[in-house]
C-alpha cells in the first residue's frame, strides 16, 4: 500500500483501492501520465518548484511529490494552495508524518498568492469557478515552463444552463449537474 493514499482514504491497508474512490484513483494516475509526458521540460539537475492551485484534499499533490521525488528522483519543492484551513492543516500534518520536507500547504486565495517569484510548473485539477483563470494568469506571469490544467467548469455552466426542450430533465438538480 501507498501510505498517503491510505491516510487520504483512497486505498485500504492491504493496498486495495476503496470502491468509492476508484474514480479518484484513476484521475490521479491519468494526471501522473500527463506529468510523465512533460518530464523532459523539467531540469532534473536543479530544484523544480511546482504549485498546485486549488489543491483541496491534495490527492494529486501528494501523488506528484511521491512520483517525482521518490520514484523519479527529482528535487522538487511542491506547494499546495487552497481556501480551506482545516484541509490545509491536515495536509501539512501528513507531509510532516511522511517526512516530505519540500511539500508545503498554505491557506489562501489564488488571486492574492505571492509566495514565490518563479515556478517551473503550475497545476490545477478542478479548481472551481474563476480559480483556474487566476492560476493560469499567475503561471503566465511567472513564466512557468509547464502548465497542466483541468478546469472545473460544471459549476459555471450549471448556473447558466437553460433549455426549454430539456426543462423536464433539468428541473432535477442531480440530472442538471450531470448535464453540465
PLM region descriptions:
Residues 75-82:
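Conserved SAM-binding motif I beta-strand of class I
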Residues 12, 35-43, 68-72, 95, ...:
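Structural motif corresponding to the C-terminal cap of alpha-helices
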Residues 23-30, 56-60, 83-87:
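Phosphate/oxyanion-binding active-site loops and adjacent basic polyanion-contact surfaces
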Amino acid at each position: 500500500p501507498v501510505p498517503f493514499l491510505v491516510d487520504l482514504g483512497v486505498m485500504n491497508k492491504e493496498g486495495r483501492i476503496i470502491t468509492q474512490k476508484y474514480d479518484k484513483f484513476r484521475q490521479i494516475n491519468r494526471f501522473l501520465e500527463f506529468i510523465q509526458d512533460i518530464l523532459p521540460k523539467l531540469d532534473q539537475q536543479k530544484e523544480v518548484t511546482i504549485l498546485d492551485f486549488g489543491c483541496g484534499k491534495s490527492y494529486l499533490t501528494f501523488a506528484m511529490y511521491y512520483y517525482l521525488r521518490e520514484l523519479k528522483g527529482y528535487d522538487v519543492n511542491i506547494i499546495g494552495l487552497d481556501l480551506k484551513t482545516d484541509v490545509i492543516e491536515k495536509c501539512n500534518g501528513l507531509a510532516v508524518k511522511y517526512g516530505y520536507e519540500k511539500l508545503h500547504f498554505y491557506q489562501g486565495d489564488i488571486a492574492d498568492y505571492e509566495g514565490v517569484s518563479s515556478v517551473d510548473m503550475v497545476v490545477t485539477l478542478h479548481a472551481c469557478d474563476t480559480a483556474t483563470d487566476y492560476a493560469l494568469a499567475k503561471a503566465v506571469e511567472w513564466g512557468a515552463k509547464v502548465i497542466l490544467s483541468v478546469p472545473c467548469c460544471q459549476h459555471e455552466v450549471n448556473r447558466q444552463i437553460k433549455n426549454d426542450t430539456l426543462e423536464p430533465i433539468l428541473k432535477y438538480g442531480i440530472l442538471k449537474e450531470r448535464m453540465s
